[in-house]
From Swiss-Prot:
Entry GO terms, CC: cytoplasm
Pathway in which this enzyme or protein is active: Lipid metabolism; phospholipid metabolism
Pfam families according to UniProt: FA_synthesis
Function, as annotated: Catalyzes the reversible formation of acyl-phosphate (acyl-PO(4)) from acyl-[acyl-carrier-protein] (acyl-ACP). This enzyme utilizes acyl-ACP as fatty acyl donor, but not acyl-CoA.
Top-level taxon of the source organism: Bacteria
Protein EC: 2.3.1.274
UniProt organism field: Shewanella pealeana (strain ATCC 700345 / ANG-SQ1)
This protein's name: Phosphate acyltransferase
Length: 342
């Protein structure tokens, strides 16, 4: 394992340095080969690193700027007018080869726009996709993409997403020949719109991708597939609905376990199992969405992430950098395109 540098937008998200900096310190303690460049207001950042151990401080660099991309900024406005923002400067560090990955909890649209313009897409990729993992019944994650980077997609774009999702699953989770499916309104070949049907036909012609066909929404968490592909409109609604249901279940479970004396006693006895279950259901446990298809690594954290959730996103960015995800995607796509054209 070699040293690597992470560029971190310290000002992004709902809480800024109050969450991003302590999480960074935790990551540095866990990984002695990691260096982090904190991009943002030095005065605010210094407040949270003042008490850190000297050995940790030596692996922190601060790139000062007071400009921030607001959550209300439109992507085009941010791209044109936030050229000294903490988000943009963090991405530029990746572009210039001074960092191997970038992480931000800021404005998603602005992050996608800046990343695409500054880092460019890989050869053979038309659009980057936002991807994250969801829990499944067999305790293995299922990757869902796109989560909102592309509201509408043609069949070729969905095909490219399937290739990238497959490589991501292979690279991060070491899954051999991951099963890939297209999210649809039915499993029959006649179901769905033209884009989904045509994407399915394209994938059937590619033996390097383990395409299993269509999958319906009620099978997302079944564990029967490893990668699920859809356009960003469907994916974003699916993700947000899933997070809402998970929080509802956690709330209801906690409420049920606090009703009545004997129930409370039972809850204390089985507390470790309950905590494990709640952790598996908690959306924060899966924090971190990757913007894949770019020439560099960009990870998006939830804006409302707490310290533990933000640490999870840092871990994801580090893992993708260690395993050279963009290069893996480029190599696999080149191999597939060569086979198609031969």
């Amino acid at each position: 394992m070699t040293n690597l540098t992470l560029a971190l937008d310290a000002m992004g998200g709902d809480f800024g340095p109050r969450i991003t900096v302590p999480a960074s310190l935790q990551a540095l303690r866990l990984n002695p080969l990691l260096k982090i460049v904190l991009v943002g207001d030095k005065t605010q950042i210094d407040e949270y690193i003042a008490s850190a151990e000297p050995a940790i401080k030596r692996r922190i660099e601060i790139k000062h700027t007071t400009e921030v991309v607001a959550m209300s900024d439109r992507p085009v406005h941010a791209l044109r007018n936030r050229k000294q923002s903490s988000m943009r400067l963090a991405i530029e560090l990746v572009r210039d080869g001074k960092a191997q990955a970038c992480l931000s909890a800021g404005n998603t649209g602005a992050l996608m726009a800046m990343s695409k313009v500054l880092l460019k897409t890989l050869p053979g990729i038309d659009r980057p996709a936002l991807v994250s993992c969801l829990p499944a019944v067999n305790n293995t994650p299922v990757y869902l993409l796109d989560l909102g980077a592309n509201i509408s997609c043609d069949s070729e774009t969905l095909f490219q997403f399937a290739v990238m999702g497959s490589v991501l699953c292979e690279t991060v989770d070491k899954t051999v020949s991951p099963k890939v499916a297209l999210l649809n309104v039915g499993i029959e070949e006649i179901k769905g719109n033209d884009q989904v049907q045509q994407a399915g036909q394209l994938l059937q012609q590619i033996p390097q991708i383990n395409y299993t066909g269509f999958i319906e929404g009620d099978e997302i968490y079944s564990g029967n597939v490893d990668v699920i592909v859809c356009d960003g409109f469907v994916g974003n609604i699916t993700l947000k609905t899933s997070e809402g249901i998970a929080r509802l279940l956690i709330h209801q479970l906690k409420k049920s376990l606090s009703d009545g004396f004997f129930v409370k006693i039972l809850a204390k006895i089985i507390a470790p199992r309950i905590r494990s279950l709640l952790n598996q259901m908690n959306p924060d446990h899966y924090n971190g969405a990757s913007l894949i298809g770019l020439r560099g690594i960009v990870v998006k954290s939830h804006g409302c992430a707490d310290e533990a959730a933000f640490l999870q996103a840092i871990t994801l960015a580090v893992t993708e950098a260690q395993r050279r995800l963009p290069q893996m995607i480029e190599d696999r796509l080149e191999s597939i395109l060569l086979d198609i054209n031969s």
